């Protein structure tokens, strides 16, 4: 039996093309979008302002396509990690992070990752597949706590700019008036920085941008992050200087502080020199140990001194709270054990 195509994850333009192809009236595209993204239905039968004839026509080859998570793990700090199926024998993880008045969902954009960053478990898993816009949006649509969400960060498994077409479609659905109608200020996309995709992302999306930096020294960054060899951080900064981040859109840099590696004042000074002239902020992140990686995280005193030095010299810097470490849901720790099981079987 042929599987049906999901409506979830279709942009308004795609829905308009679909209804035209099926001989439905043009206004049906916005009606379907409203059912999917505003009313968040799970079946075509619920789309009651479409005639029975058109609902039956849609159901011949299409379905909403909502897929609930198949597993969940709960941390002592309230963080919840969800496992979603994304095609045959493929899975991704999303992390729900409640925090007082805010609730953030960290979503994935790929199964695995090609970037092979030294400090990241997803990179150790290798790359398997790009997620479709449907599979990206489903992580939000099918989240049990969906109605509590205030923010989405694309900082889960995968490199978003390596799957730019589907990521941009998902962002269009999240921010478009026909879709979830979220302000772009509620969404942050994190990237190692790919030459091919960075400029296009900045020009086609208004969402916040976070750059994985981790070292201001080219040779050291290349050792930690092979992507540096293709597009250096100095080139990236020069490109970023062509754009205005002084208004509502935020540019931030992510910096894991490693013990004895990049945690001295020398590195803080290099960061200030590298980022001079950019309207940006710095997020310091504690390293979470992963198997087979001989790196250690700096202690909190060192991180605090590092933060204070940057802040007093004009670079607004915060230390990101570490959440979900006990369930392997913290930064750099996402890697689906389920995927590994299937790969071995």
UniProtKB/Swiss-Prot annotation:
Binding positions for S-adenosyl-L-methionine per the UniProt entry: 158-159, 190, 212-214, 288
Binding sites annotated in the UniProt record for [4Fe-4S] cluster: 113, 117, 120
GO biological process, alphabetically ordered: rRNA base methylation; tRNA methylation
Tagged with keyword Iron-sulfur: yes
Domain Radical SAM core: 99-326
Protein's cellular compartments: Cytoplasm
Taxonomy, superkingdom: Bacteria
One GO CC annotation: cytoplasm
Major location (coarse): cytoplasm
Cofactors: [4Fe-4S] cluster
Cysteine disulfide links: 106-331
Its EC number(s): 2.1.1.192
Pfam families with a match to the protein in the record: Radical_SAM, RlmN_N
Miscellaneous comment in the UniProt entry for this protein: Reaction proceeds by a ping-pong mechanism involving intermediate methylation of a conserved cysteine residue.
Protein name: Probable dual-specificity RNA methyltransferase RlmN
Source organism per UniProt: Bacteroides thetaiotaomicron (strain ATCC 29148 / DSM 2079 / JCM 5827 / CCUG 10774 / NCTC 10582 / VPI-5482 / E50)
UniProt lineage: Bacteria, Pseudomonadati, Bacteroidota, Bacteroidia, Bacteroidales
């Amino acid at each position: 039996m042929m599987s049906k195509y999901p409506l979830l994850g279709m942009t308004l333009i795609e829905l308009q093309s679909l209804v035209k192809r099926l001989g439905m009236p043009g206004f049906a595209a916005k009606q379907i979008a409203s059912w999917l993204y505003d009313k968040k239905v799970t079946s075509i039968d619920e789309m009651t302002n479409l005639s029975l004839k058109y609902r039956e026509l849609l159901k011949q080859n299409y379905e909403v396509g909502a897929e609930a998570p198949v597993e969940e793990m709960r941390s002592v700090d309230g963080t919840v990690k969800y496992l979603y199926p994304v095609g045959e024998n493929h899975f991704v993880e999303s992390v729900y992070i409640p925090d007082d008045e805010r609730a953030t969902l960290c979503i994935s954009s790929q199964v695995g990752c090609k970037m092979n960053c030294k400090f990241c478990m997803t990179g150790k898993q290798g790359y398997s597949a790009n997620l479709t816009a449907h599979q990206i949006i489903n992580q939000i649509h099918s989240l049990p706590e969906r109605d509590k969400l205030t923010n989405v960060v694309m900082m889960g498994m995968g490199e978003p700019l390596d799957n730019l077409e589907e990521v941009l479609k998902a962002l269009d659905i999240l921010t478009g008036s026909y879709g979830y109608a979220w302000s772009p200020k509620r969404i942050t996309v994190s990237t190692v920085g790919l030459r091919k995709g960075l400029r296009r992302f900045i020009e086609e999306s208004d969402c916040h941008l976070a750059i994985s930096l981790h070292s201001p020294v080219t040779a050291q960054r290349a050792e930690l992050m092979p992507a540096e060899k293709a597009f250096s951080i100095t080139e990236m900064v020069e490109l970023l200087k062509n754009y205005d981040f002084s208004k509502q859109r935020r540019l931030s840099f992510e910096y894991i502080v490693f013990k004895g590696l990049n945690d001295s004042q020398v590195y803080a000074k290099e960061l200030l020199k590298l980022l001079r002239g950019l309207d940006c902020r710095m997020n310091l992140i504690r390293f979470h140990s992963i198997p087979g990686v001989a790196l250690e995280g700096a202690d909190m005193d060192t991180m605090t001194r590092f933060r204070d030095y940057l802040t007093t010299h004009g670079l607004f810097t915060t230390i990101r709270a570490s959440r979900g470490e006990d369930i392997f849901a913290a930064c750099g720790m996402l890697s689906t054990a389920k995927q590994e099981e299937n790969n071995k079987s």
